Amino acid sequence: MTKLTIHSPAGLHQVDVADGQTVREALDTTDWRVRAACGGIGSCGACVVQVKSGDVNPLTLPEYQRLDEAARAKGWRLSCQLRLNGDTQIHTTHLAKPSPWRSIPKADLMQHTLQCKDISQYVYGIAVDLGTTHLRVTLWNRRTGQRIASRKGVNPQDSYGADVLTRLDVALQHPEKARKLSEFARVAIIKALRDMLAREVGEIKSMLSEIGQVMIVGNTAMLTLLTNHGYADLLNPDFWQTQIHCQPVDYDEWHAQWLLPHAKITVLPPVAGFVGSDLTADLVATKLCNSSNAAMLIDVGTNTEIALWTGKKLLITSVPGGSALESVGIQNGMPPESGAIVHIKQSENGLIVETIDNDLALGFCGSGLLDAIAVLVATKVLKPSGRFAQSTGGAGFALIADNPHTMIIGRDIDAFQRAKAAIASAMETLLEFAQMSWDEIERLCVCGAFGRHLNIENAQALGLLPPISPEKIELNADASLAGCELALLCKDNVALFEKMTANAQTYNLSLIPSYEDRYINHLLLKPIKSGEFS
């Protein structure tokens, strides 16, 4: 990683740039996007920046074509052609208008080799992963198997509640708000698509008519709210072990709103109850069931979905994993964006606090909250019960003394304990049904945005992850999006998903007494015990 310092009318900013990444690609993942309209090939000339100092790559052919000699002499470059060989400072006045959309870093996206070579028209398609907190969308040329662009942003439905149950209740009690929730999600999807087309292709209207497929996955609650259909069944426990029907009632309305006249819109069906098609996408992307070895998958989020593959059969469940793991409802919680604390380490000289973009700490994202609690337990500031060893007078504990944004209070710790207890208890209960122990698990996939920056050692120390070798644990943050992309590129996409979970056994843990007993035990901030379950 090299450091890029940006001087602009909006202020001074620093960004980490990965090896091989262009300056534009790095800026597209932040709040400081430059203007662009050609997808990074250097033909539009809109993304100009001025290099003030640093070691950078030589001028490219597109730069000789788009920039005159005087501009080149003053250090002006096209950011889509500019790569860093060392720490660099640039100046720009060509920032794009503020946008809620960011590119997904390429390192976070899985690579695929599938192609739909027999497609002769309407070759473009989009994959949509609709989560409770975030929305992720990618644009593809299905015939060539090329991912053209990606976008992520906040799910605007959060204005009606941070968690799924609140939104479902709002929809059930207020039909007009249910329509609003559906509208919010649909508008967000098309806005993400239009942002990609404007910046990466330079053309919107004609490209919309060339899109032939829209593939959507998500947790069941989000799918019912998107389609405005099926959410009443989801709130009925009698349906928690059956598939919830949540397909759009009027596809013509969607086509008209999105201006996608030729697109086949597919909402991939959920498995059952609160287990959505995002879990199936995880299974497809990670190939969890492609081996005879026992494996487990956890998609951590506000609604956490868990799958256990015994080598022969698939067991599935879901639990309210707690919005605390996404820092929702935490006093100083925030999404994983600039200024969010992502890692905390204890050193001889005190705490090392790492934030996204190395900005001033503004709060905790999920992984930062976990690290903070782990450090407080390790230094005996916190007891395993979750209580502070010494009274804080209700004020909590600030990791950085003069920064109130690093304060953790008792309510934050309690929310984390409830979330991790629900997940740990669910994992053990599935093992009980399979008559297995942790020693038999050869692979554990942690999916969802929470896993992107997760410190595995700390997660095990607090009892969120099981006592297996860290080498067996994989972090697959964008697996559900990757699975959706594979479905987009596969002719038999719906059949692929249905086959994956056709013989799965789904469990409603609210009906299992042993789950409740385990939940109480797992509230303590200590490692999960190894062994068999009965």
Model-derived regions: residue spans:
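Catalytic phosphate/nucleotide-handling subdomain of diverse soluble enzymes
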Residues: 310, 436-501
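Conserved phosphate-binding catalytic cores of ATP/NTP-utilizing and phosphoryl-transfer enzymes
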Residues: 106-123, 265-295
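Acidic, glycine/GT-rich loop-and beta-edge segments that sit at the periphery of enzyme/chaperone cores
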Residues: 4, 76, 95, 99, ...
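N-terminal phosphate-binding loop and adjacent alpha-helix
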Residues: 157-199, 329, 340-345, 418, ...
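Immediate flanking context of iron-sulfur cluster ligation sites
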Residues: 19-45, 52-79
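Glycine-rich phosphate-binding loop of actin/hexokinase-like ATP-binding domains
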Residues: 137, 145-163, 232-246, 281, ...
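Phosphate/ATP-binding catalytic cores across multiple sugar-kinase/actin-like superfamilies
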Residues: 188-199, 279-282, 417-439
